[in-house]
């Protein structure tokens, strides 16, 4: 089955595990993460290009956002979204990190949730440019990676620390501290593994091949 998901991804369902390397070789494209503790997706609306209400190019911002964060691991799953106006069609206010387009810039919000317990994201900062919004997202993202407990979602993390402390230690931190956070994120990104590239040329092919059961050996 091929399914278009609510997070704007494509699910390929029902494929045998042993066939996965051949399937990805034929597709010639990377895979997103479905279950890992890391970045899941960046959902976008159509922004200024196809919507009369759009005030910012949310599609381009979302593409760049995904490029900066894909393949990175985190204490728990991270979902992101960008919307071109406050109508919030891509649900940025209930994502771990969201960018909300305004007439004169972006609101960056963090710590939202839309699952069993719904939580509206907190405002991290309001900025004028897309690059500033992306940098604010990077600061929060790396701060969360370094300071959250394992299996702690961003909404629990923000509530535990308080949004004022989060702001103080990310977007309003002294310039050297901000630069250090960003440098560590860049370094992590440079060494981020591509699990599906490894899957196409596995060191141990038995990862995708069923093992033959061992016969019982009598003493």
What are these regions (language model features)?
Residues 1-6, 75-78, 146-160, 179-187:
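Flexible, glycine/charged-enriched surface loops at secondary-structure junctions
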Residues 79, 84, 88, 93-153, ...:
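Mobile "lid/hinge" segments at catalytic clefts and subdomain interfaces of large enzymes
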Residues 1, 28-32, 70, 74, ...:
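Generic secondary-structure signature for well-ordered alpha-helical cores
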Residues 171-205:
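Acidic, Ser/Thr-rich low-complexity intrinsically disordered segments
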Residues 162-166, 172-173:
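Glycine-centered helix-coil hinge/cap
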